[in-house]
Amino acid sequence: MSNVNTLSALAKSGALSGKRVFIRADLNVPFDDAGRISEDTRIRASVPGIRLALDAGEAVMVTSHLGRPKEGALTEADSLAPVAQRLSELLGMQVRLVPDWVDGVSVEPGEVVLLENCRGNVGEKKDDEGLSRKMAALCDVYVNDAFGTAHRAEATTHGIARFAPVACAGPLLEAELEALGRALHDPKRPLVAIVGGSKVSTKLSILQSLADKVDQLVVGGGIANTFMLAAGLPIGKSLAEPEQVEQARAVIEIMKRRGAEVPIPTDVVCAKSFGADAAATVKAAADVAEDDMILDIGPQTAQRLADILKAAGTIVWNGPVGVFEFDQFAHGTEVVARAIADSAGFSIAGGGDTLAAIAKYGIADQTGYISTGGGAFLEFLEGKALPAVAVLQARAA
């Protein structure tokens, strides 16, 4: 799908031996109050790309951003030092942290060094050409293995790729592009998308883009409440955006004209207040009272969605369908999650809340592909070009 050069193809060809490789990874991991890494999925995900380069006989430089430091003024809290330590453990070899690296790095074939937080460099976020050229001069091969930042044009994700002698995608980025392409460019039908979240306004362009492509567009959370309003149903004091009703109607209309559908809930789970101890009541969608808040889809709607998902050829999942953090409002999301797990179709899931739901119901192994990119995943769904991918495509052309 993505017609880019790949690290795996270069490694196979034997063209990398003795070369200097610069890998832009996504090692932006969370820390606990004691300054320890609390969740290391992203670091573990970067290991195959680093190993591939090492096994091909390269001298390996790796960098990433961490948090949002002030350019030119890194503090101890912004340092990748704990990441270097964790990477050393995972690779079974010492990974040296290099602080000031833009003007030159000494690294030998078979060695891995971690270049300090790239967002500390002045000009990184602006994709500065001078900085990009300096970084490109450090390497023979540039590898982007950070899908999570593919929607940003920064010096380490975009600029350097313009000037490095060779620019390619690492295995993580390659797998991500393949999965997304399989889901949206050449999907097995029926294609079903689930878009949850609180606001139509933040996901409107995604809803509009998907309305042209999918066979069923399932909406959840506050977004579903706005669509219920658009369908003339009462929603009480539920979270919704009345000013987006016309847009919601337009999406329903586009789908209808194509013979596709936005399944509107027929029953819902309501409460009089929002909280872990709120009492849940199941009601028909038409019977929602003025003081009710809709916090989940009802069992009848959940079953209908499960039937749609089980028959799907391809599923794109972004967002829960209810307030699944509270168990009494989690049934809808659980039914949807288990239906995706049981579906024979190919599924791709992305976004923080979605990943939390996958973890809660233990269905990671039954989900076709779990996207590592939040913002990048959403922009891909919108049909936008991702700058970091576009530059690799241009270099491969």
UniProtKB/Swiss-Prot annotation:
Pfam families: PGK. Keywords: ATP-binding, Cytoplasm, Glycolysis, Kinase, Nucleotide-binding, Transferase. It catalyses: (2R)-3-phosphoglycerate + ATP = (2R)-3-phospho-glyceroyl phosphate + ADP. ATP binds at K203, E325, G351, G352, D353, T354. Its EC number is 2.7.2.3. InterPro entries: Phosphoglycerate_kinase, Phosphoglycerate_kinase_CS, Phosphoglycerate_kinase_N, Phosphoglycerate_kinase_sf. GO terms for biological process: gluconeogenesis; glycolytic process. SUPFAM superfamilies: Phosphoglycerate kinase (SSF53748). Substrate binds at D26, L27, N28, R42, H65, L66, G67, R68, R119, R152. One of its GO terms (cellular component) is cytosol. GO terms for molecular function: ADP binding; ATP binding; phosphoglycerate kinase activity. PROSITE patterns: PGLYCERATE_KINASE. It is found in: Cytoplasm. Pathway: Carbohydrate degradation; glycolysis; pyruvate from D-glyceraldehyde 3-phosphate: step 2/5. The keyword rRNA-binding does not apply. The keyword Transmembrane does not apply. Gene3D superfamilies: Phosphoglycerate kinase, N-terminal domain. It is an enzyme of class 2 (transferase). PANTHER family: PHOSPHOGLYCERATE KINASE, PHOSPHOGLYCERATE KINASE 1, CHLOROPLASTIC-RELATED. Monomer. Belongs to the phosphoglycerate kinase family. This is Phosphoglycerate kinase. The gene is pgk.
